[in-house]
């Protein structure tokens, strides 16, 4: 008998859970969070359990596992995860843990296998998770059907792979249907990752997202990014000028001609998709504003499509141009440590050194990511001070941050089993 299965150690985080709910219910929604949300390891553990283990996350792109047996791995808190392409082309996700004695099955970030074989004692699994071989000494009453890999919820749409560690994750199909439609012109099954980077930021994951959700800091911090990016979120942005609105109107005619979706679509505060122009005379997020890849994505014929921006909370933002896409994902490590992964995707037939130069492709966002890292880290250092107290957000410039923290508060209270106040979306988002 497994005595640990009946042994209850209690929940050492229970006092912190109650404190978390109390602080969220009483917080001023126009101010930053109380200090423990950014600094305390106990609240970080609650973030992982109630947000990252219960919400939908972007694990990767379907083009990263194009054929049977292709896999990718990732780490979500203490949980190693495996995503693999099955025999019939399906995408499967499993806990990357052998059912024998718990060793990780796949140790590399990406690869290709015929079967999943544990490196410890060679227990062998089919690509759909079924146990095929467990040696010959497990006893007559051993039933291999009871020891398949533990599955993880997985959905795909528009070339993205979404996973959730929860048994009953929140509904997401309405967003995925829209994402599939908006991504159709890019034909993501015929894309590839040209280059990928991961940087470590000495800051809480929420500070990383907060920094992304506003461009209040852009003029003073991001000269490379502002060579092409128009900082307004869309035409409802309270900062948007009439000239910007006129530019959007002119661009929509061209997008209609190309049958390119562009209308703002939001799904609560968690998801939004919108296509916005880049700076007039530029077509891609490069230092000179020219194409980063000569070969355009999918069925796209005109490189001047602006940038389609995709938000997926809690951890991803994306820019989709005519010639390449950039996918960002945020992975919490500890209360004050976060990984930020950036992937640049191009057409699968684009040839490095001929159609695109990797250094040029990544130049703008390498600089921007490093600038954002420094901003988040300095933000964290200040918040650690005894002098910190929550400060006010600008509803004109920081509405995206307000919306993120409202989403976070609502989901945290919901997942803790607590009631939350009605969350109002701030205009411009």
Swiss-Prot record:
Induction data: Transcriptionally regulated by GbdR.
UniProt-listed InterPro entries: Rieske_2Fe-2S (IPR017941), Rieske_2Fe-2S_sf (IPR036922), Ring_hydroxy_dOase_asu_C_dom (IPR015879), Rng_hydr_dOase-A (IPR001663)
Gene3D superfamilies in the cross-refs: Naphthalene 1,2-dioxygenase Alpha Subunit, Chain A, domain 1 (3.90.380.10), Rieske [2Fe-2S] iron-sulphur domain (2.102.10.10)
Catalysed conversion reaction: glycine betaine + NADH + O2 + H(+) = N,N-dimethylglycine + formaldehyde + NAD(+) + H2O
Molecular functions per Gene Ontology: 2 iron, 2 sulfur cluster binding; iron ion binding; monooxygenase activity
Cofactor: [2Fe-2S] cluster; Fe cation
GO biological process, one term: glycine betaine catabolic process
Sites where the protein binds Fe cation: 217, 222
Name of protein: Glycine betaine monooxygenase oxygenase subunit
Family: Belongs to the bacterial ring-hydroxylating dioxygenase alpha subunit family.
Phenotype caused by lack of the gene: Deletion of gbcA and gbcB abrogates the ability to grow on glycine betaine as a sole carbon source.
Binding-site residues for [2Fe-2S] cluster, renumbered to this chain: 98, 100, 118, 121
Keywords: 2Fe-2S, Iron, Iron-sulfur, Metal-binding, Monooxygenase, NAD, Oxidoreductase
Function: Involved in degradation of glycine betaine. Part of a Rieske-type oxygenase system that catalyzes the conversion of glycine betaine (GB) to dimethylglycine (DMG). This subunit is the terminal oxygenase component of the system. Required for growth on choline and GB, but not for growth on DMG.
Species of origin: Pseudomonas aeruginosa (strain ATCC 15692 / DSM 22644 / CIP 104116 / JCM 14847 / LMG 12228 / 1C / PRS 101 / PAO1)
PROSITE patterns (alphabetical): RIESKE
Cofactor annotation comment: Binds 1 [2Fe-2S] cluster per subunit. Binds 1 Fe cation per subunit.
Sequence ranges assigned to domain Rieske in this UniProt record: 56-163
CDD domains: RHO_alpha_C_GbcA-like, Rieske_RO_Alpha_N
The enzyme's E.C. designation: 1.14.13.251
Keyword Iron-sulfur: yes
Subunit (UniProt): The system is composed of an oxygenase subunit (GbcA) and a reductase subunit (GbcB).
Keyword Iron: yes
């Amino acid at each position: 008998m497994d005595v640990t299965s009946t042994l209850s150690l209690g929940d050492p985080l229970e006092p912190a859970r109650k404190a978390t709910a109390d602080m969220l219910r009483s917080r001023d929604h126009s101010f930053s969070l109380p200090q423990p949300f950014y600094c305390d390891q106990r609240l970080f553990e609650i973030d992982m359990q109630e947000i990252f283990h219960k919400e939908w996350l972007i694990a990767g792109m379907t083009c990263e596992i194009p054929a049977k047996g292709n896999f990718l791995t990732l780490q979500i808190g203490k949980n190693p995860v495996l995503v693999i392409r099955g025999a019939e082309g399906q995408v499967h996700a499993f806990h990357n843990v052998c059912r024998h004695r718990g060793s990780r099955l796949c140790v590399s970030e990406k690869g290709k296998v015929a079967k999943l074989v544990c490196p410890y004692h060679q227990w062998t699994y089919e690509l759909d998770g079924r146990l095929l071989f467990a040696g010959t000494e497990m006893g007559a009453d051993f039933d291999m059907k009871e020891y398949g890999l533990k599955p993880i919820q997985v959905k795909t749409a528009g070339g993205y792979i979404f996973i959730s560690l929860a048994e009953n994750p929140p509904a997401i199909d309405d967003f995925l249907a829209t994402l599939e439609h908006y991504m159709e012109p890019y034909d993501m099954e015929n894309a590839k990752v040209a280059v990928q980077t991961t940087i470590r930021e000495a800051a809480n994951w929420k500070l990383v997202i907060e920094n992304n959700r506003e461009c209040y800091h852009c003029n003073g911090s991001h000269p490379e990014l502002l060579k092409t990016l128009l900082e307004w979120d869309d035409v409802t942005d309270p900062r948007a000028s009439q000239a910007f609105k006129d530019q959007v109107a002119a661009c929509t005619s061209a997008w209609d001609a190309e049958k390119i979706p562009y209308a703002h679509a939001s799904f609560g505060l968690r998801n939004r998709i919108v296509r916005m122009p880049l700076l007039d005379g530029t077509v891609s997020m490069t230092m000179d504003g020219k194409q980063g890849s000569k070969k355009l994505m999918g069925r796209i014929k005109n490189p001047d499509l602006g940038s389609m921006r995709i938000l997926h909370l809690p951890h991803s933002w994306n820019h989709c141009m005519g010639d390449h896409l950039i996918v960002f994902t945020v992975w919490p490590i500890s209360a004050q440590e976060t990984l930020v992964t950036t992937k640049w995707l191009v057409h699968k037939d684009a040839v490095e050194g001929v159609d695109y130069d990797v250094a040029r492709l990544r130049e703008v966002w390498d600089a921007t990511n490093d600038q954002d890292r420094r901003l988040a880290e300095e933000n964290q250092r200040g918040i650690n001070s005894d002098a910190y107290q929550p400060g006010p957000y600008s509803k004109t410039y920081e509405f995206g941050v307000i919306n993120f923290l409202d989403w976070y508060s609502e989901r945290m209270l919901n997942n803790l089993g607590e009631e939350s106040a009605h969350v109002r979306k701030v205009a411009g988002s």
